[in-house]
Design a protein with these regions (language model features):
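Short, Lys/Arg-enriched N-terminal segments with co-localized hydrophobic residues
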Residues: 5-23
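A positional/architectural concept
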Residues: 37-82, 86-91
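Intrinsic disorder/low-complexity signal
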Residues: 5, 20-21, 46, 58, ...
Length: 199
């Protein structure tokens, strides 16, 4: 047991609780430490990983299989944003990631060194590359490839590979994106209470 404790100390693994008293997979990397809201106001799934220089806002959900690796620069996730299954978020030196409030990042997305505005939705399997900027209230379609340094204004539907803005979103679609982020806040709170591993 003493050897295990010594190994954990050497790895500098943080000790954050989630459902059923288990440990969330949240890690310091040397002097780079995740900044987290109060316990119960965020959730990191048991097999997701939050590493290093990462800031999580209030009511953020990091879902199964996702990796946020803040080794080279900052990853900042806004309030009530959800990062869905198997998403990869990474940074190069001097290319941080900023994701705004009330965002939905769909399954299997790749978010790398870019900025995503408030209340935006990134569809399943989309890729957004270094120094790209997505405005507020935007929808990046499933499978889209947003290339480096590309910028899009607020309220746009962005699709294709390479991605292009094809039209403005309707007020109804923007409201739907807000509802999506609110739903995922309710959902992670349900998982905190009800998720239990079968022994």
């Amino acid at each position: 047991l003493s050897l295990l404790i010594e190994l954990i100390n050497k790895l500098n693994i943080s000790n954050k609780n989630n459902y059923q008293g288990e440990k969330m997979p949240i890690y310091n990397l040397g002097k780079k430490e995740p900044q987290l809201p109060s316990e119960g106001s965020y959730w990191v799934a048991p097999d997701a990983h939050v590493i290093g220089n990462v800031i999580l806002g209030q009511d953020v959900g990091i879902w199964f299989g996702s990796v946020l690796r803040g080794d080279n620069d900052l990853i900042k996730i806004g309030n009530e944003t959800n990062i869905q299954e198997n998403t990869i978020i990474h940074v190069d030196p001097n290319t941080p990631v900023t994701i705004g409030n009330n965002c939905t990042i769909g399954h299997n997305a790749i978010i790398h060194g870019c900025t995503i505005g408030n209340n935006s939705l990134v569809g399943m399997g989309a890729t957004i590359l270094n120094n790209a900027k997505i405005g507020n209230n935007c929808l990046v379609g499933a499978g889209a490839l947003v290339t480096e340094n590309k910028e899009f204004p607020d309220g746009m539907l962005i699709i294709g590979s390479p991605a292009k803005a094809v039209r403005e979103l309707s007020p109804e679609m923007i409201k739907d994106m807000t509802r999506s982020s609110k739903h995922y806040v309710d959902n992670f709170k349900k998982f905190i209470k009800e998720l239990e591993e079968i022994k």
